[in-house]
Amino acid sequence: MTFGLRVLGSYLGLAIITAVVGFGVRALSLGLDIGIIQAVAAHRDATVTSIAEIVTYAGSFPILAPIAVAVVLLRRWNRPADDIALVVIAAGSAALPWLVKLIVARPRPSLEQLQHLSSLSFPSEHTTQAAAIYLTIAIVLSKELGRGLRELVIGLAVVIAVVVAWSRVYLGVHYPTDVAAGLLLGWSWALLVFHWARPSLEPAS
């Protein structure tokens, strides 16, 4: 199977699975989601709010796309298969949540928002992008490192994505289930493309 078909299969498969989960979430989890948002809002602090407003930009595509491009350029096309995979993962991390949002059509939380957004909510686009792109960059850049350092770099990428997810809930623009789905979707997309689709680009040994 070619790289393109594997990417397409991963994209459609994850979109369908996430959409099905999204319909279940809409039907079953609203009370829990609202309870968590209200609990978070009740303990907001001005300093933490300022941090959340900054941290949340780490999941913004206008920030992440140049970072991904810079990684590719700095590597000087050293490993073309890795670089192509990074570009595809970055693009897909924006396109996947967009498609699922259209299908599930879950409105944003209507209370406790610190940033007022009117777009759809499930899954969190910022979280999906952060999960997919930071993990892929970490995998690509840590290939030549020892096991301990490699695990540290990948762990840092995971932490960044989780912090972005937290910021979206803290700011009241996403339900907790939106960001949980975003994390799982982003990581799944990155791992499928990198470890299943990318090897088909490698020269035959």
List each model region and its residues.
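Membrane-helix interface segments
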Residues: 47-48, 78-83, 110, 147-152
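N-terminal transmembrane-helix/juxtamembrane module of multi-pass inner/ER membrane proteins
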Residues: 1-63, 102-114
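Membrane-embedded catalytic cores of phosphoryl/pyrophosphoryl-handling enzymes
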Residues: 68, 112-205
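Aromatic-anchored segments of alpha-helical transmembrane domains
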Residues: 19-20, 91-99, 159-169
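Hydrophobic alpha-helical transmembrane segments
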Residues: 8-12, 56-75, 83-88, 133-134, 141, 151-158, ...
